[in-house]
Amino acid sequence: MSASPIADYHAFPDAQGHFGRYGGSFVAETLVGPLQELAQAYDQARQDPAFQAAYDRDLAHYVGRPSPIYHAQRLSDHVGGAQILLKREDLNHTGAHKINNTIGQALLAARMGKKRIIAETGAGQHGVASATVAARLGLECVVYMGATDIERQKINVYRMKLLGATVVPVTSGSATLKDALNEAMRDWVTNVQDTFYIIGTVAGPDPYPRMVRDFNAIVGREAREQMLAEYGRLPDAITACVGGGSNAIGLFHAFLNDRQVEIVGAEAAGDGIHTGRHAASIAAGRPGVLHGNRTYVLCDDDGQIIETHSVSAGLDYPGVGPEHAFLADSGRARYLGITDEEALQAFHLLAHTEGILPALESSHALAQAMKLARERPRDQIVLCNLSGRGDKDVHTIAAREGLVL
C-alpha cells in the first residue's frame, strides 16, 4: 500500500460512488433502477432543510444525542502512557451507534413512500435499531440474521421480536453476517416496489457507503467539537473497531483532513491472522468485489470468499467498507489486528477500572487504544469510539469462561 497525497478527503466519493479505485456499484440489472432511485431520493433529502431538521430532532429527543466524551482516568492510569478518552456511543437509545444510521434511512424510506423495511444484522444491534425505528414510524420490519449469530445473540433476537420485527434465520454459508446480507439483497430484488433496504454498514453498492457514512458522521463531528470545547485541542490519535466499518468512518470522517491526528482501525484478528481464523480484511485480504462494491475482501486464490472468525458477531465479515480500503491505500489510516483474547482482556479491564461493559466489537477498539496509549507520553490523548454496550455479549463471555447463565 503506497501513500499518495490527497488534498481533500471530504471530496470522496466521486459522482459514480468511487473512493479512488474502490466502491462503485456492481449489481444485477434488476437493482440498477432501484439504486438510482435511492441515490436520487437521498441526494434530494440531504438538501432539504425539513428532512435534516426531522433527523436532528430525532437524534436529540429520541436517540439522546449528543453522546459525551468520557476520560477513562483509572483505565489510563492502569495502562500507562497517554490519556484514553471514550466517545460514549453505548449510551445511545438501543445501546450502540447503529441507530444514528437507521433513523436517517427510515425517515428516507417514509419520504419515499415505502411501507416495509428489511435489514441484515450480525451482532443484532443493527437489527434492533432497525426494528426500533420501524416501530417508531409504523413500518413493517423483517431482519435477516445468520443462524450462528442468532445462537450467540439470543437477547437481541428477542428484543427485535418484542419491537414487532420478524427475524428470518439464514442457514446458508457460514450462517453469519455476509450470508444475512446476501438474503436481504435477494428479498429487496423481489420486493423493491414497497420495500426499503436499510444496510447497516458502509458497504454495498453506491449510494449506501456514503449514505451510511453521512448518517454516522455525527459521531465525529460531535467528538471534534467536544475535544475543542473541553480540551482546547484535537486528540493525538483516534481509533475504532472495523468490521464493515460504520462506527469507524463515523468517527474518522470529521478528522480526515486534520493530518496531525493519527487514525487507526482495529480489525478482528480472531485466533491470530497467522491461523487463518480471523476477519481482518485489510490486513490479510486483497481487492475484489463483494456485495456490490469493490473493496478489500478475504478470499482464496480462486477469488472465492472464505469463512471468517471473530468472537464478535458484528466484526465477523469478510469485507470492509470501500472508504476504509481507500484510506488504507492512501496511507491516511492504519488498520491493525486485535485478537479475540486481546478484546476479551480489554472488556474485563474496562469493567473493572471504569464500571463500563463495552460491546465485544468496541472491546477491539479499546484494546487498540490501550496499545496506542502505551506508546505515548501522558500528556497525549487517544480517543476511542466505544461503539456499543456489552449487555448483549454477557452470555457469550460467560460461556467462554465455562459459566451457564
From Swiss-Prot:
Q: Which InterPro entries match?
A: Trp_synth_b_CS, Trp_synth_beta, Trp_synth_beta/beta-like, TrpB-like_PALP, TrpB-like_PALP_sf
Q: Specify the superkingdom.
A: Bacteria
Swiss-Prot/TrEMBL cofactor(s): pyridoxal 5'-phosphate
The protein's Enzyme Commission number: 4.2.1.20
* Reactions accelerated catalytically: (1S,2R)-1-C-(indol-3-yl)glycerol 3-phosphate + L-serine = D-glyceraldehyde 3-phosphate + L-tryptophan + H2O
Check the record and name the SUPFAM superfamilies matching this protein: Tryptophan synthase beta subunit-like PLP-dependent enzymes (SSF53686)
Supply the enzyme class, top level.
lyase
Q: Name one Pfam family in it.
A: PALP
**Database matches in CDD domains:** Trp-synth_B
Any GO MF annotation of the entry: tryptophan synthase activity
UniProt KW keywords: Amino-acid biosynthesis, Aromatic amino acid biosynthesis, Lyase, Pyridoxal phosphate, Tryptophan biosynthesis
> Where N6-(pyridoxal phosphate)lysine occurs along the chain?
98
Task: List the GO cellular component terms.
Answer: cytoplasm
Q: In which pathway does it act?
A: Amino-acid biosynthesis; L-tryptophan biosynthesis; L-tryptophan from chorismate: step 5/5
Against PANTHER family, the record matches this protein to:
TRYPTOPHAN SYNTHASE, TRYPTOPHAN SYNTHASE-RELATED
Please explain the role this protein plays, according to its UniProt record.
The beta subunit is responsible for the synthesis of L-tryptophan from indole and L-serine.
Which HAMAP family is this protein grouped with?
A: Trp_synth_beta
- What family, per the record? Belongs to the TrpB family.
Q: Could you give the subunit structure recorded for this chain?
A: Tetramer of two alpha and two beta chains.
Stated name of the protein = Tryptophan synthase beta chain
Q: Which gene encodes it?
A: trpB
